[in-house]
Amino acid sequence: MSYSFLKESKLYIEYGGSKYRIYTTTAISFSQTFAEDSYPVKTLHDQSKMLAGTTITKANPAQFSFTVPLTAEKDESIVMDLITDLVATSDSDIETQQLKSFNIYVQTGSSTFKVESCVITGANFSFSQLEQFKVEIEGQGTKLSRIGNESYNLGVIQSESPTRTPLLIYPEVTVDSLNMTSIISVSVQIQNNVDWTPFETLHSSLDVTNSSNAMFPSAYVVSERIVSGTINQYQTDNNITQFDDFSTNSNINVLAKKKDGTTFWAIQINPGMYTARMNVADVYNQAYDFRSTDNTALGTRITTYS
């Protein structure tokens, strides 16, 4: 008998016919549950049947999450593309924007798991003074299955750099061309609200006997996309008057700077809104909660990734 340890897990992404090894922290999670429909069995003539009966015919969307440290070599650039880019689709001459779909493979000490037709529903970039730059990913897929043991052959994996150089960065923020000082930390979140279309039919439900022939989700629509974040700043005599500030039309630029002062990653939110709030702590500070109101392509607003 052998056990599977999280620290030994390897994660791969398959997109466009190519597979990529993605180096993650141990913050990997994936699962899928089945939906239960209960029904009463108590009748007028038999009041003793107090416990409900049940039917299980369909699965809920699979859930996954993982954290990727970003490196100078940018071998994880496929992840950045999947976060930002949308694909235009057309149905009955109506054009819609869909998220890029991909497969995830996770190899453990005893198994190889696959999550099919994945989409990213959330990405969180969080950075502060000279900390390693990471992005936290979460999303959903249609089906989770075990496709083999630890020796399962995934085929050709895209080549990767011989080295992995972690990035220690610090945040730099400008609001309407004014540089913000005394910054503690910055976070930027990209959220995709996904609604899975109904997929249960009476005919298919009658054929379900176990998980192998259960009904799984297959199609979705993106109902809303949100780009937002928070800037945390020490309160000083230079910015004390801004603790209750707000704006509905500002140009916000968030940059992740390397130790040598060059920019590794940057996003421009223009126009955007923000509200300021004060935090009472050992050292007084204030936070700016911001959100993009710009509907242009997100990929064009990430102005630097190099």
Language-model regions, residue ranges each:
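Signature of extracytoplasmic/envelope-associated structural regions
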Residues: 1-306
